Amino acid sequence: SNILVFNKDNDSKICDLGRSACLDISSNFLTMRYTGDMTYSPPEVWYRFFEPDWKKRTYAIDCYMLGSLITFYFAGVSMSALILSKMPNQYHYLVWTGTFNQVEEYLHAVFSEVIQEFERNIIGEFYKDELIELVKQLCNPNPEKRGHPKNSTLSNDKYSLERFISKID
């Protein structure tokens, strides 16, 4: 439901990454920590990490959502579902009472396992390595480390999706 196919040539576009919000338009969603379906939310939401900068928080989540959509397309399950399926119970967000920083190393360990599982679901060697790297950059469990490495020096565009979309296109 997130990919629209337009014609007999199968031209397609990503159509939805969650509930939309814009700083220039008044909305009840602007004050929410996360506006989407919790089933697909990124790890920082589960563990109550809150980035006060709206743009930074929202764009980091957008990165994760795009990576999760790509994961779903190839693995048949979202990144969030994969991470939670491998998370040891004592570190599951419903049980965990510590901070996001305290659970981060466990998230990264599980993320490594999930990436290996994702890799096994990609058929075809032509784009496999690039696709894996793309998902790693988009879905890093630490929102501060998400995004394309070439964007890391661009303070306003750290989470820009343009480089990723160019790769996918």
Residue ranges of model-derived segments:
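Conserved C-terminal C-lobe helix
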Residues: 125-141
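A structural signal for well-ordered alpha-helical segments within the folded catalytic domains
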Residues: 39, 43, 61-68, 129-133
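Conserved C-lobe activation region of Hanks-type protein kinase-like domains
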Residues: 48-124
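Activation segment/activation loop of eukaryotic-type protein kinase catalytic domains
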Residues: 1-43
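Conserved hydrophobic scaffold of the eukaryotic protein kinase-like catalytic domain
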Residues: 22, 37, 69-73, 134
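A conserved short helix/loop substructure at the end of the activation segment
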Residues: 139-153
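Regulatory extensions appended to serine/threonine kinase catalytic cores
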Residues: 152-169
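Residues at helix-coil transition
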Residues: 43-47, 75, 140-143
